[in-house]
Each structure stands twice: as C-alpha cells, then as structure tokens.
Amino acid sequence: SGWIDKEEFFLENNESVELVCSLVVGNTEIVKTTLFSGSSFVVNHHIAQQGEDNGLDLYLMWDSGINNTEKNLYDDVSYSGVSASYNQEIETLSFIPGSLNDRLENRGSYSGAIDWAAIRNKYFIMAMVPESSVGLVVLDGSTKQFTNKEFSPVYSVTLSDAETSQNMSINTYFGPLDIDNI
C-alpha cells in the first residue's frame, strides 16, 4: 500500500485515498475531489466551483474508451458500445470502423434526466452514475488502429449539468461486466 515513485499508489482492501485537484479560472475556483477505495471498483468524483463567477459549466468526461480483451478483434468490437439512460429511455450507439477516419455516425447528445452513461466491451464496463440526475450526456466514438487492416472503436462519454453547475457528484464503476458489482 502507499505511493511508489509518486506515480502509482496501491490500496489494500481496508484503505482509501482522496485526491484533490483545483483550477482557478478568473474569480472562480474549480475543485475536483476523487475518492479511491481498495475494496471497490467504484470511484467517487465530486466537482465544485466557488467564487464570484460561478457561470462555468462543469463536465466529467471519459474519452479513452476501454481496451480490447479478445485476440479476435471482431468478436470484441461486436460487443462494444456506448449507452445512456435519459428520461427513462436507454440509448445505445455502436459502430465497427473500417478505416482510421471512421467515427460514430450519429453522435448522441441527450438532455433531460440523465441517470447513467456507460462504455462497454465484451467483458468490462465503465459506468458513470450521478448521485442525482444530471441534465446532459454526450456519447461519441472515434477509431484506433491496431494493424494495417484492424481498427477498433474508442468510445467517449461526457456528463454535465448546466442547470446546477456549481456542484456535481458522479460515481464511476470500471470493472467486470457483472450487474451484481455495479
């Protein structure tokens, strides 16, 4: 447990660590607090802005997708996608790229009561679950190249709540695709 070379940290089951980052923009300070627990795949994120000019929109984005797990890339890609639950509906988007320039055709931008958003592949999921419903989710996808003829989608999710943008709390789960763990 603890820091190693100030680049990595390891946690035992009963340990947790809180990482606090801040950014000052004009007269506003944005503070992001992230809590990691050694006994959970869930990471807690709290973003708050304080100051005279609280008009900045807050976003939490996952833009690096999930790495492939199968040697047979097509098998892995066929299970991958990006989804969101908004206004009690679930929208799932996916694509199978044939070139490096391919992108998700119908990038999804949804507003309303956003309950969760997720990126998945065959075995793993990264789910973002706000502690209270947020107002905007953007689902997108680009392409990563493996060999001259093999391409894989890279999905991204962005959550925001412009109406109550002074504070936003979101839990992320990144682990096995097992509904009992989420």
Language model: regions and residue ranges:
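Soluble non-transmembrane domains of integral membrane proteins
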Residues: 1-182
